[in-house]
Every structure is written in structure tokens, then in C-alpha cells.
Amino acid sequence: MNALLIYPEFPDTFWSFKHALKFIRKKASFPPLGLLTVATMLPDEWSKRLVDVNVANLTDKDLEWADCVFFSSMVVQRKSAHQLIKRCKEAGVKIVAGGPLFTSEHEQFKDVDHFVLNEAEITLPSFLEDLKNGCAKPVYRSPDFADVRETPAPLWKLA
């Protein structure tokens, strides 16, 4: 399975610090920590790639390579998330989404195939098991909180 992890673009606002980043030789303010942690939790035999749209463009080759895409977004990334999800849907790629934006507004994203909401450390394993067995549901959620002492380290080699 080829899993493409996509982090949508932050809009250019005062709080994005976009214009100040060049002074400290950085391309983005906020690394995709959630997606890098999810990447660690995906099966080892899967091939994984990360596209952080804040530092690189999503290409047609990326979408051709992918069997599925995983999105994580904050609410401020809503516009970019909608645009990228539409593009993935048009490419015929299976879409999985989680993170703050989708946890609070998943009803607004009709093109997403599967939502892994709330704490991925809790909900992602159930989704992956169902996916392996061919019975993945549209929505996975739990009211429980993850114990951060048990959260795996992010897969930094993708960054």
C-alpha cells in the first residue's frame, strides 16, 4: 500500500509568520507533527510519503503513486484542505482524514472516504484493522484521550 500523507497550506496571515521565516531560514512555522506520528502508526510494510503543501507542491505524480491519502488539518487550513481533497477525489485516490478540522467539521467534507477522529492513537488501529479486512467504516471516533507517554515518536525521516 502506498500512503501519501498531505498537510494542507496555512493561509498567509499575520499569525503565519510567512514573511519572517526567511530571516531564520525556515520554510514553515508548523511542522506536520500529527501526520508524522500517524506515519509511524501505519503498517511497516506500507510505503509512505509526505507532502507538506507549505513547503512543496502536490504533484500529479504524487497522486498517481498513492493508493490512499491521509490528511490532517487545523481549522485555519480549511480552504486548502477542501481544494486538495477535491483534487485527490478527481484523481480517484481513497481519502482518509483526521485532526482538529475534521474532528470538528467532518460533515462539511463529503468527498472524504474515511474519518479517523479525535485521538489517532486510539482510533487509527481500529480503522487499519477494518481496512485490512475489507470492512472499513466511514467514521472512527472515541471519547477517550491518548496517553502521550505511549504515543510513538514521529517518523521524522519523511520530513
Segments and roles (model prediction):
Residues M1-A159:
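Acidic, low-complexity intrinsically disordered segments
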